[in-house]
Amino acid sequence: MEANIVKEEIKKILIESLNLQISPDEIKGEDLLNEFGINSVDAISIFISIENTFDIFIEDEDLSAALISSLDSITNFIMDKNNR
């Protein structure tokens, strides 16, 4: 799967998980935590959606604010998981 496709899917996950009333194009994705005020409950919902959408398992030690800090960090994580 290509990185740009992964990013678009992540944007859809963010919109759904955070109940955002915006289009995917409006997500800048450089600082997701501050851009959307993601809390721990939101993060768990996002992680679960990522696991289901991309058919990956996120290990407990991978769960962190750094992982969902930006679109690039999430994309890189998913691409790494899919390449294993």
Label for each model-derived stretch:
Residues E2-I38, I48, N52-R84:
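Phosphopantetheine-dependent thiolation modules in NRPS/PKS and related acyl-activating systems
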